[in-house]
């Protein structure tokens, strides 16, 4: 868990889209063809040519032109291309089998080449993986092509590995997964049409005035298309790749077995419990009805919030594998670096305020730290929140103890950090002193913003490097897995801290947390829990 947290603070948090507009982070697409009036036989099926029955062709054209004037047109990555998604488990297994054979042959060819006169072994990388014959350029391309073809859980893991630090993964392997993170292919029109018909019915065109044929975003689970409802509402329609929901467990097992065998992933990177948690989270993300319900929950929770807004769900375009939402504008957080210091400070303060509200007030958090899920609109000075597939609840038995761990760190009380970590079941109490000291130090480092009496300079700290130095001890000497809630929670908190660091925020966090702390226990109508004896 600390490995993931430290690495998150060193890298970007998932695929960063350019003006992404729907809960589906990823690369963005080429200029699309519209399914609309008089454009094709499909377009004609949604054309409303009778008075009062919908938008005319001119209406749609004017709406589209108005939209283009508001914001730059998103585009898919140059590496993205149309490619069929293997939908059956057999076809997906065949893809992994082909990759295994290809990696083996590629490694053999690499060894042979280096064994010839004039050949030499590579020595790059600090993790001991740099000299692996499996990490040739040809094999790198095989891995990228396979993951971008199968997509789903396998691509999701590849994107997760892209944010790991090269203290644990060789620079070559890191570059491979960085290419995976930036390159997501989209399914062909016929396959997308099949999903739409299976989910919305053969008459699905009657629900929209137009829908773009090529997506503006493509990621690990699905792709996103821009559309227009008959009342003129612009929408973004997320369509899930076929077969990904049914292949989560097999994809995870096949990919990790292959990578451990060929390139030697670090021991402890994906422990058994973290794998189970990952599979559960992926299953949640594949259930678009659940995501729609979570989005509606957040829309209600934040209805009166002056800074954050949540787009409305389009119920008639919502099924298990299709999700329609109101189209939102704005720029991802990473593109806010050019704004004034004051605006950046306000954005980051509000982001931390949201994290604390989610965990300690709502006890319900959207845990995906992808910056493209937070779109800042300068005209309204608001942030639109997107992608609620990874939302989850937290019980009071967890938050009661977790808030005390943070409070102890904010107060600089190392002994209480250790004790409350045991109460939280983060520790057993029988760990080595080296492990206990490393754990407490990591918590104290993360608590520094809440301990500072004045504005904390997120851009000047070395939080990531300091935590990264503790991770080897934390991996080697852990006696029990951390609470399962912390995997997703710490990814989200790390993403928030990283955003503050990237935007060089200077904000006073101590009063923000202290106010949250007192409000929390007031709402619980009880006193803070004493440390267990």
UniProtKB/Swiss-Prot annotation:
The name this protein goes by in its record: Atypical kinase COQ8B, mitochondrial
Major site of localization recorded for this protein: mitochondrion
Top-level division of the source organism's lineage: Eukaryota
Lineage: Eukaryota, Metazoa, Chordata, Craniata, Vertebrata
Gene (UniProt): Coq8b
Pfam families: ABC1
Transmembrane segments: 93-109
Subunit structure: Homodimer; homodimerizes via its transmembrane region. Interacts with COQ6 and COQ7. Interacts with the multi-subunit COQ enzyme complex, composed of at least COQ3, COQ4, COQ5, COQ6, COQ7 and COQ9.
Topology in the lipid bilayer: Single-pass membrane protein
Family membership noted in the UniProt record: Belongs to the protein kinase superfamily. ADCK protein kinase family.
Entry GO terms, CC: cytosol; mitochondrial membrane; mitochondrion; plasma membrane
Alphabetical GO biological process terms: cerebellar Purkinje cell layer morphogenesis; ubiquinone biosynthetic process
Organism: Mus musculus
Annotated compartments: Mitochondrion membrane; Cytoplasm, Cytosol; Cell membrane
PANTHER family: ATYPICAL KINASE COQ8B, MITOCHONDRIAL (PTHR43851:SF4), PTHR43851
Annotated active site: 368 (proton acceptor)
Enzyme class: transferase
Ranges where the Protein kinase domain occurs: 192-424
Function: Atypical kinase involved in the biosynthesis of coenzyme Q, also named ubiquinone, an essential lipid-soluble electron transporter for aerobic cellular respiration. Its substrate specificity is still unclear: may act as a protein kinase that mediates phosphorylation of COQ3. According to other reports, acts as a small molecule kinase, possibly a lipid kinase that phosphorylates a prenyl lipid in the ubiquinone biosynthesis pathway, as suggested by its ability to bind coenzyme Q lipid intermediates. However, the small molecule kinase activity was not confirmed by another publication.
Binding annotation for ATP: 220, 238, 325-328, 373, 387
Motif AAAS motif boundaries: 217-220
The entry's keywords: ATP-binding, Cell membrane, Cytoplasm, Kinase, Membrane, Mitochondrion, Nucleotide-binding, Transferase, Transmembrane, Transmembrane helix
InterPro entries: ABC1_dom (IPR004147), ADCK3_dom (IPR034646), Atypical_kinase_ADCK (IPR051409), Kinase-like_dom_sf (IPR011009)
UniProt-listed Enzyme Commission number(s): 2.7.-.-
